[in-house]
């Protein structure tokens, strides 16, 4: 039995909107869906006329719908944006290689330039190779930390004003819930922000912040948008999976709970005595970090030294690992030598900047001289840095103990913000999906 | 009496991965009383269709598709391209040549 469209347009309704409960026809749905995103963009002042904007594209439903909608709105409302697609190739066989094909389809369909950056080029390791080293337990930590920085680097190369990500209302509600469940007040405070990014970084914006997942999927279906849907082949995070399942169960009973949780997150006030980590620049790669050496650099050093657990476990374990490592190396000088050798090797073999060898600004890192002349002046610095770094792992991480608990295997990912965690790819698949 | 009911089932958004990657399939349902003698319904509804799918087409673990007697929250159901929430959900009575689509929202974005 046909249900008439709530808007009185005379058409039959095709879906019930979760946000309002209204029955609505296809045309009115498209209009409402796009107009609400337009409203989110203008009210949040996400863009300025003439901006270059990178859409973080995974080939999945959210980023595909985001790219499509931004193109539509850019033309309809004369945003004057220069839109492009930015994809990260983690090097996960059977997952990312397939989804990148979808991204290339997006590039052709939406006539946007596409930039693909790979972990292999940036860090010297694919996720497949990392998983071969570390096993499947903590791979989301690596993936999330590397992806976050990879997007920053890609955005810098593209010289964009901001990065638009496909996080939807369900994702954000889930993150609020997760941060409550973990007692993670620092992230709780940040995770509902529509624009994130501190000084010196390229801001991330979330135009789909108030858009329900159901509507994104229905929109893609009715518009016949091609997207890629599969699960990440690596182990998902069980805790997040439970949070997601809980949220979906509650949403079924009362769909407005998604908006209500976001609202709660937005309006919750944080007691002043809760100390929030301050942002600074990583002494090695110069990207924003809350530590002297950023997580990506620590993880990478672990990988390159054959200590893949470095930076994952508790600080006491990190210290133990490093002590063992140093014993193996006989003394610190050997370790320093080792680091120098690494740098020299890097100079010869790679044109692409690698964290292990860098102490220079990303901005300088575009020419063929990237990791050559810039590295020279940093080799000597690294000697003292290494000492600092080694001390640091055992000392400063004390403030981090809570976040470093082993069972919260992706807790480190969101150290700075929620943007580039596996929650936008594999993390959400927690209950086996 | 012994007439079968023909409907088309479709799977998308990753739900096809639970059904051996089958994206669409025409199925012939036997009279309801031969499939489920104890059923309280006279005619096939979506509720019985889910049971039939579980018994006949589902290859992955059941809990990835079903929860209690319905689909797992996060799987959308379209009846002839329309949201099943407009059509009584589980109580929708199947008609000849209906197209029933299951779309997962739970796969990566
Ligand atoms: Zn209408
Ligand atoms: Zn760094």
Curated annotation (Swiss-Prot), chain B:
Its main location: cytoplasm. GO terms for biological process: protein urmylation; tRNA thio-modification; tRNA wobble uridine modification. The keyword Zinc-finger does not apply. Keywords: Cytoplasm, Isopeptide bond, tRNA processing, Ubl conjugation pathway. Gene3D superfamilies: 3.10.20.30. It is found in: Cytoplasm. Pathway: tRNA modification; 5-methoxycarbonylmethyl-2-thiouridine-tRNA biosynthesis. There is a cross-link at residue 109 (Glycyl lysine isopeptide (Gly-Lys) (interchain with K-? in acceptor proteins)). InterPro entries: Beta-grasp_dom_sf (IPR012675), Mopterin_synth/thiamin_S_b (IPR016155), Urm1 (IPR015221). Pfam families: Urm1. It comes from Bombyx mori. CDD domains: Ubl_Urm1 (cd01764). Acts as a sulfur carrier required for 2-thiolation of mcm(5)S(2)U at tRNA wobble positions of cytosolic tRNA(Lys), tRNA(Glu) and tRNA(Gln). Serves as sulfur donor in tRNA 2-thiolation reaction by being thiocarboxylated (-COSH) at its C-terminus by MOCS3. The sulfur is then transferred to tRNA to form 2-thiolation of mcm(5)S(2)U. Also acts as a ubiquitin-like protein (UBL) that is covalently conjugated via an isopeptide bond to lysine residues of target proteins. The modification 1-thioglycine is found at residue 109. HAMAP family: Urm1. C-terminal thiocarboxylation occurs in 2 steps, it is first acyl-adenylated (-COAMP) via the hesA/moeB/thiF part of the MOCS3 homolog, then thiocarboxylated (-COSH) via the rhodanese domain of the MOCS3 homolog. One of its GO terms (cellular component) is cytosol. Belongs to the URM1 family. This is Ubiquitin-related modifier 1 homolog.
